[in-house]
Regions:
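N-terminal intrinsically disordered, cationic/polar leader segments
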Residues: 1-60, 67-78
């Protein structure tokens, strides 16, 4: 069986996105066709929080994200 090649492509990272957004809480919702990840900043002593980023993924991409996070967490813990 021939080895599958990973497609190569360029990824552009705009400066305002590259600075990132701090989040200390994540909320996950899902439907039959998508996973929604809301990243929230919850400040101490506050009764409300604000979603700072929402990412919408297909189930396949959500599975890929889980695998990547597991790999990186394993490396981090070594």
């Amino acid at each position: 069986m021939a080895e599958q090649e990973t497609p190569q492509f360029n990824i552009e990272l705009p400066e305002e996105v590259g600075q990132g957004q701090y989040a200390n809480l994540a909320v996950v919702l899902h439907s039959q066709s998508e996973f929604i990840l809301d990243f929230v900043r919850l400040l101490p002593g506050q009764q409300s929080a604000r979603v700072h980023s929402r990412q919408i993924l297909t189930p396949d991409n959500a599975k890929r994200l889980v695998r990547l996070l597991e790999q990186h967490l394993a490396c981090f813990e070594q």
